[in-house]
Amino acid sequence: MIDDHEALLLLVLSSGPAALASLPLHPVLGKGYRNTPGALEEKAVRISCVRECLNVVQIGGRIPVLLTSAAELPRLGSCVR
């Protein structure tokens, strides 16, 4: 489990509907990354910008996620808005 004080799970880049449905609300942005209408399309639009800001890391070998420290949150915010 990732310690929220060390690194935050910020955005799931790609996943299947079942995995998306189980995702909680984002701890910082307050948004859910669930398989709701438009959710996948919204992520696709954001990915190209966010990828430029943060490193992509594989969790469990399947779900690519973005990890960042709390110090980098302002930079992330400018990317995903």
From Swiss-Prot:
Keyword terms, alphabetized: Signal
Signal peptide residues on this chain, from the entry's feature table: 1-20
Keyword Signal: yes
Name used for this protein in its record: Uncharacterized protein TP_0791
Protein species of origin: Treponema pallidum (strain Nichols)
